């Protein structure tokens, strides 16, 4: 008991660090949708040929996007779900700029029985940070 009192700050830091390290795994497990790093995304793209779904706004998409990405802004996704029907049992790599909109999009797609969803961890920002190519709309 004396040890705990004297080292409460260190114990708190250790517990906090452990939670911070485990959070991505816990978060991934809760959604059931795997987060893939930019490097893993490139491997997925070369092996499984997924639909790359960009759910960012039009201006963001035009400023730069992954080659071959299908653009459906998150705000339009529910109304445009029919465009994606043929991908229900095929790999789909969903991304936005940082990851929050993609997470919402994955939840919407999962509710429509899409079975092979992947989310680009860190979004296009992480893709660009990894020095991977983007293309701009003409």
Task: List PLM regions with ranges.
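Rhodanese-like catalytic fold shared by cysteine-dependent sulfurtransferases
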Residues: 1-50, 58-91, 100-138
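Conserved beta/loop motifs at nucleotide-recognition and modification sites
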Residues: 53
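Short, surface-exposed ligand- or partner-binding patches at beta-edge/loop junctions that are enriched
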Residues: 94-95
């Amino acid at each position: 008991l004396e040890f705990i009192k004297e080292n409460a700050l260190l114990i708190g830091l250790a517990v906090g660090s452990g939670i911070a390290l485990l959070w991505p795994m816990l978060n991934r497990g809760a959604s059931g949708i795997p987060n893939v790093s930019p490097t893993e995304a490139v491997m997925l793209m070369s092996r499984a040929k997924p639909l790359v779904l960009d759910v960012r706004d039009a201006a963001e998409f035009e400023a730069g996007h992954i080659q071959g990405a299908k653009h459906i802004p998150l705000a339009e996704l529910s109304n445009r779900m029919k465009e994606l029907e043929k991908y229900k049992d095929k790999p789909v790599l969903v991304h936005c700029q940082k990851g929050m909109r993609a997470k919402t999009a994955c939840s919407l797609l999962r509710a429509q029985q899409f079975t092979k969803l992947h989310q680009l961890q860190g979004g296009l920002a992480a893709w660009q940070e990894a020095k991977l190519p983007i293309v701009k709309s003409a």
